[in-house]
Design a protein with these regions (language model features):
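Pocket-forming structural segment of enzyme catalytic cores
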Residues: 1-76
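Acyltransferase
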Residues: 73-134
Length: 134
């Protein structure tokens, strides 16, 4: 669903379940977000695993996961994405300046916690690969 604005910048995300892919993350963690569409309901049969005031930030359905936030972004990527939105007049200079004020080494360091989901996901994949065929 279109939000009418952007969620962009380092934002708090809250775990809403006890999913293995988010294991080891604090109940509230920081992650970079950039989107203008909110996930307002999970697909049929899916479980919400993370969210914030902007909607669902993560869900799981069986052995498939989806997240709305961007744990893969480094400082350079976060800055380039924000500047690009200003260059394409998707957001005002004032809005982008506010985002760029938050693109700091401290926020990036805090957001690195979210990168744990990569290792957690690989662990699930390896476990699934080594399990006997059904």
């Amino acid at each position: 669903e279109h939000m009418g604005s952007y969620e962009i910048g380092y934002r708090e995300v809250e775990r809403t379940g006890d999913d293995r892919v988010l294991a080891g993350l604090d109940n509230r963690f920081l992650a970079f977000t950039t989107h203008q569409d909110a996930v307002v309901e999970t697909p049929p049969g899916a479980t919400r695993i993370a969210g914030n005031d902007y909607g669902i930030q993560g869900f799981r359905k069986g052995r498939a996961w989806g997240v709305q936030f961007h744990p893969e972004y480094d400082l350079d990527t976060a800055e380039r994405i924000a500047v690009k939105k200003r260059d394409h007049e998707m957001l005002t200079s004032a809005e982008i300046d506010a985002v760029l004020d938050g693109v700091t080494p401290e926020n990036y360091d805090r957001a690195c916690e979210a990168k744990r989901l990569f290792g957690n996901f690989i662990g699930v994949v390896e476990e699934t690969r080594s399990a006997p065929a059904r």
